[in-house]
Regions:
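A short beta-strand element within beta-rich, extracytoplasmic domains
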Residues: 35-47
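Extracellular adhesion/glycan-binding regions together with long Ser/Thr-
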Residues: 69-120
Length: 194
């Protein structure tokens, strides 16, 4: 076993079909002895229609800032902007270094990164990209199987509930659409009569 523990947080937010990147998992690793992030293995649930998944990506998200020490965050910043006009569909390249990508994945996804760790807190995240024709009724379930550091399996501590189901969504408006920096969209409701 690897000597350092990897803390894992699975998101509970909608997967936007039109996005190239959607945060699926966050990873926080205090590299006291580990020097290399070798791979992360992920399993999709048996009910997942894998033909809807375009890509699964692993990103390096940087290190912990001194002012955040002790806050036990899972990300130093938001990796995908919700307010930068024209830049709300993909990871912000300044804060996201792509380490691995698997196109049209199978049920077991192996993200081989061989990424050199910095001493201290390192952040990684897994992104999910769906195909444009994916139905809004599609549901995704996934589970972390293992993380390897320096060729050894790491101890992983999950900081989120089990059996999370990720649902699809569409961003009705994005910053920059029709030349507008932002939009106010009133809440949409359905009555008992439809």
């Amino acid at each position: 076993k690897a000597s350092d523990t990897v803390f894992v947080h699975q998101t509970q937010i909608p997967i936007l079909i039109e996005r190239q990147d959607n945060v699926l998992f966050y990873f926080r690793l205090d590299a006291k002895e580990s020097r290399m992030m070798d791979e992360i293995v992920l399993d999709f649930g048996k009910s997942v229609n894998l033909s809807d998944v375009q890509a699964v990506k692993l990103y390096y998200g940087g290190t912990e800032a001194l002012q955040d020490k002790g806050k036990k965050r899972f990300a130093p910043v938001d990796y995908i902007s919700s307010h930068r006009p024209g830049n709300t569909l993909a990871a912000i390249p300044s804060y996201s270094i792509k380490c691995a990508e698997v196109l049209q994945p199978s049920a077991k996804v192996v993200l081989k990164s061989h990424y050199k760790l910095f001493p201290g807190i390192n952040f990684f995240w897994i992104s999910l990209q769906m195909k444009p024709e994916t139905s809004l009724f599609t549901k995704i379930s996934s589970e972390l199987q293992s993380v390897k550091l320096d060729g050894k399996e790491a101890i992983c501590e999950e900081r989120s509930p089990k059996d999370i189901i990720h649902r699809m969504a569409v961003g009705v408006r994005h910053a920059g659409d029709d030349g507008s920096a932002s939009f106010r969209i009133p809440g949409l409701v359905t009555s008992n009569k439809g």
